[in-house]
């Protein structure tokens, strides 16, 4: 498993986890999770994350889980399996949470994410 963190600014960071290859994950060939975390003095607070946890047919595309309503998933849809499009959609969700003034910092962090297919 590959994991690491990418700082956005002094208050937020991205944490990624790319698991080992698994044939159950059709398009990306592995499970992955990317978390947006708020940095606090003594701990980190979970804000949202993107993953591809569903392996059933037609649900291969990544989706976002938000902290305030954990049961709600925002699906990108099968038509957006292009990694660049997925990163742009994820960037928009991050900016909605941390504010438009942090868009440039968030964009720099999101561009450092590598595709799970590699």
Which residues make up each language-model segment?
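Small/flexible residues
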Residues: 4-5, 19, 46, 61, ...
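Mixed-charge, Lys/Arg-enriched low-complexity segments
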Residues: 53-118
